């Protein structure tokens, strides 16, 4: 019963989740940040390496032709030592040089917290979208946290890149041999047999700077969610329409009044078109609807009738 109740809760969460956010840049980049953070702290925090060298004494019975030195994260090399022959009937402890734990641990810590934050932010995007956008506090806090992590990735990746360079120098068998007194004695021969494999550590630095790119790039997508970019994204106002000048369209050189009008002269002017002569008799004579003689003197009025009141007077 308890298992069924738990499954119901899970089903409700899944049903109420907004998984489409994973397809959007804001959520998709968070998934990449989550994955790349895992690679960053896994390749660095789980590292262990080994180097091998040999000491061939003049007295062959005291030689040690296979000295193996192991070291691992967090690279406190000053605590790593191995037994080397003195070629005088005994052995001595030889310690490596350097403590590079601070840069390595700082890098891994940033990666772990980035992993946790990415997972929490992604869960908030999916299941608590309304709470995330309430009062716009979620996007603003998300933007500030993203900016902080971007800066931390820059610092930690740069510090760890320098620390890794120092680790390589400190674990180089040739440099170790130079510091061994027995190797400076005449008749003794010291050789390096195997260098430590540091490809995993190189990968951790690459993932560190990839995380930096992801977090810096994600700043823009989170910034758009805050609404602070709205004033910058607003469309500029359109150009005002040009008002026609008085007399330009319907003025002195108006519609059909001359070369500035819209039609040929005499289209609707006083010299053409329908201009009845109210001085004619009841029939539309003179220059009415048709040419003279069509509806004029042979039309409705009698022939020989006066054509205007002026003729009668």
Swiss-Prot record:
Pfam families: MARVEL (PF01284). Residues 253-263, 282-302 have a biased composition (Gly residues). Keywords: Calcium, Cytoplasmic vesicle, Disease variant, Glycoprotein, Intellectual disability, Membrane, Phosphoprotein, Repeat, Synapse, Synaptosome, Transmembrane, Transmembrane helix, Ubl conjugation. Residues 1-25, 131-137, 224-313 are cytoplasmic. One of its GO terms (cellular component) is presynaptic active zone. GO terms for molecular function: cholesterol binding; identical protein binding; SH2 domain binding. Expressed in the brain, with expression in the hippocampus, the neuropil in the dentate gyrus, where expression is higher in the outer half of the molecular layer than in the inner half, and in the neuropil of CA4 and CA3. Expressed in the putamen (at protein level). It is a multi-pass membrane protein. The modification Phosphotyrosine is found at residue 81. Residues 264-281 have a biased composition (Low complexity). Residues 254-305 are annotated as: Repeats, Gly-rich. Residues 238-313 are annotated as: Disordered. One of its GO terms (biological process) is synaptic vesicle maturation. It is found in: Cytoplasmic vesicle, Secretory vesicle, Synaptic vesicle membrane; Synapse, Synaptosome. PROSITE patterns: MARVEL, SYNAPTOP. Ubiquitinated; mediated by SIAH1 or SIAH2 and leading to its subsequent proteasomal degradation. The chain crosses the membrane at residues 26-49, 107-130, 138-161, 200-223. Glycans are attached at residue 59. Belongs to the synaptophysin/synaptobrevin family. It is linked to Intellectual developmental disorder, X-linked 96: A disorder characterized by significantly below average general intellectual functioning associated with impairments in adaptive behavior and manifested during the developmental period. Homohexamer or homotetramer. Interacts with SRCIN1. Interacts with VAMP2; the interaction is inhibited by interaction of VAPM2 with SEPT8. This is Synaptophysin. It comes from Homo sapiens. The gene is SYP.
